[in-house]
Amino acid sequence: MTSSSRGYQRVDSSGDGGSLLMEEEGDNPHEALLHRNNDDYASTYHHVGVEYDSYEELERHEMDDRVTEIPEGFHRRQRRNLIYGDDVATDEELRVLRREALFGEEVTRAGLGRAEYYEDSHLIHSCDKSGHEDIDDESDDESKDEDEEEEETGIRKFAKLVLPHVALVLLTCTYTVIGALIFYSVEQPHEQMMKEQQLKLIYTRQNEFVDDLIRLAAGNETKRYEWESLAERHMHNMSDQLFVAFEKYFLTSNEVKKNAATETWTFSSSIFFAVTVVTTIGYGNPVPVTNIGRIWCILFSLLGIPLTLVTIADLGKFLSEHLVWLYGNYLKLKYLILSRHRKERREHVCEHCHSHGMGHDMNIEEKRIPAFLVLAILIVYTAFGGVLMSKLEPWSFFTSFYWSFITMTTVGFGDLMPRRDGYMYIILLYIILGLAITTMCIDLVGVQYIRKIHYFGRKIQDARSALAVVGGKVVLVSELYANLMQKRARNMSREAFIVENLYVSKHIIPFIPTDIRCIRYIDQTADAATISTSSSAIDMQSCRFCHSRYSLNRAFK
């Protein structure tokens, strides 16, 4: 060690244990750059002006590029590991550096430099720790915000799914109530006035009849035909007046007896009338009799009927989807209960389809609710209406069942009408739900039959354009059938008919041998076709997926 040039060689961590390297030229030491390794901390001094190694720079730049490509979550975990890891310098290392400073100026500089480095690094890590704690708090806040956003998005999705249906129902109800209010405000005053006029006319006719009877009695009239003619004339006038009052102004016998008019156009009856209009039931009692009321009825129906039909169809679709869901769960439960007998009832699958992952348990058909089940639901609901109306109205069960069926099918003859206003809203709820159930039945059963009708129609259309080979010529089946019918019309004799049948059976109907099921197909192996007649029999099966036929050897028991 000399005064002109002194140096401490740094040994690598894999060598003698990591010494300090200090290089000086003269009395002016150069600035040092401290680098932190994964295993230990060391200080390395470089001469000013000396360039870094190109390989180290390249590696550093590559690492920088790779770090930028790492996701943010990985950076967060890495920073947490650095914060709570064992990389921070301990107090024992600081004491060792202070002891090394007692052995010389150079060692003191090196030791103090290293101690300052560790103190600075400890301060930096403490700052980083506090900073990362803030980052963790921010990340927790961000996660909470994300959870809240997910909840909000879930609520929004649910709202988007439910709100249109709820809004449609509320719109229909609001529209019906507004229409009922207008009907009530227009028809109720006019109805009260007209009923009072009709009662006055009825009692006027009655008083006239009594006056004529008194006049005949005062004149000592004893001829019978005079009394009969007088009574007949007044009775006809009275019956005409009563019929008009009942038919046109819905006057009842109790009102005539008490000589007091009661309100037919109450608010409940107005809502009931509005519902019967928009649902196209139309009982016909009561009806608007004023011009303003009739004009409003037309305008109200133009928008109310489509709106109500759409709403009822939406409710029916909702019920049909839930009924299909319940029926599917019923089938699953039935499948689980009867799973031990599944092998006996399962359909056959050929080896080719089985090799492609198609098995016996694969469900390739949509769940279709049987028609009798839907019809049973409709009948049960109608019977429930019969029981309900027999309790609410003075009707028998059969009369109530008849009214319920007429209402559910929107026929609405009007011969039976609920009269009790106290139960009007219960009856309205029953009617609306019944119309939704009727729509559900049409949606579940009617669509299936419509599909079948279209299927047969397409098949018939395809059959018309089918080709047949007759006498070496290709002709349409429709043309062949027309020619045969013309020939049959010309040859009505039995002999010609027999010859024609023989011709048809010979040239049109292909020959089908009786043992066709025993004939081996071209793609069937010889081993599968070899069957012992003494111990087994041939059972031709059809594949569930590709519909190809193949034979199974089934031994006699």
From Swiss-Prot:
GO terms for cellular component: plasma membrane. Keywords: Glycoprotein, Ion channel, Ion transport, Membrane, Potassium, Potassium channel, Potassium transport, Transmembrane, Transmembrane helix, Transport. Glycans are attached at residues 220, 237. It is found in: Membrane. One of its GO terms (biological process) is potassium ion transmembrane transport. Residues 1-34, 128-151 are annotated as: Disordered. It is a multi-pass membrane protein. The keyword Zinc-finger does not apply. Residues 1-165, 316-368, 447-557 are cytoplasmic. Its main location: membrane. Pfam families: Ion_trans_2 (PF07885). One of its GO terms (molecular function) is outward rectifier potassium channel activity. Belongs to the two pore domain potassium channel (TC 1.A.1.8) family. This is TWiK family of potassium channels protein 7.
